[in-house]
Structures are given as C-alpha cells and as structure tokens.
Amino acid sequence: LPFQIACAPWIDAIKFSDKLNSYGMEGIRFRPLHIKPFFSVFSGEDIQGIQIFITNYKKAVLTEINFYIMQAIAELYPDRAVFDKANTNRHRMFDLVCGSDYIRKTFTQTNKVSSIQNFWRKDAETFKELSKKYYLY
C-alpha cells in the first residue's frame, strides 16, 4: 500500500478519516484503516490511520492530499503538528520539493491548507499546458 496510507500508533482511524472526509476534497475519499506492519516503521505494532481512494482523477488535486493530512493531524493531535516534530534537517528537503520555504513557513503558522493554496496552485495551469507535449497517455 505504498503512497496510499497514513498511519501511526497515536491516530484514531475513525476520527482521522471523518476529519479528512469533512474537508470535501473533490475526487478523493478516505477510509479508516487498522494494520500491523511487518517491516519498516512501526513494525509489529497495531496502528491506525487512513487509506486514500481516488474516486475521480480529473477533479482530484493530488498534490494537496498530504497538506490536508498535515492539517487534520494538527487539528486532531495538536501536540503532533508535523513541522513541530520534524527533524529540522528534513525541512530543507521539504522546501526543495515545494520550491521554496514559503509553503513550510506559512503552513506552520496556521496549519491550514487554505493559507498556502493560492501560492501552491499559482503555476499549475501553466505547468499543465507546458508539459502536455511530454505526456505518454
């Protein structure tokens, strides 16, 4: 299930999935998940979380899913806000992936997707147009 789940020992699967579904993300649904990983992080532990389902690829804004997950974590588990707990060495990689430190710094202030959404989406349509010639399907 790589890239389909978000789980941790301290998450309540029902509350987490309900919170994420309450955001009304178009083309995306979340279902509660209870698993016991047999390798990697939390190996052998009973953990809970969500599984992500894409219901409409044309409407889903896939690049925002992780931001909504971080928002839900901050709302349900304020002592676990993602950037508050992250190793600061990891901030640089996040900033590189996002193109600047603006996303991280702004999101950290509010823990709300709405605070970064316009900035995050500002070049999306231009990118879609420029990249069309490289699509294989």
Give, region by region, the residue ranges found by the protein language model.
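Conserved functional hotspot residues or short segments at active or partner-binding sites
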Residues: 2, 6-119
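Intrinsically disordered, low-complexity regions enriched in small/polar residues
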Residues: 79, 85, 129, 136-137
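Flexible, low-complexity junctional segments that flank or bridge functional domains
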Residues: 121, 125-135
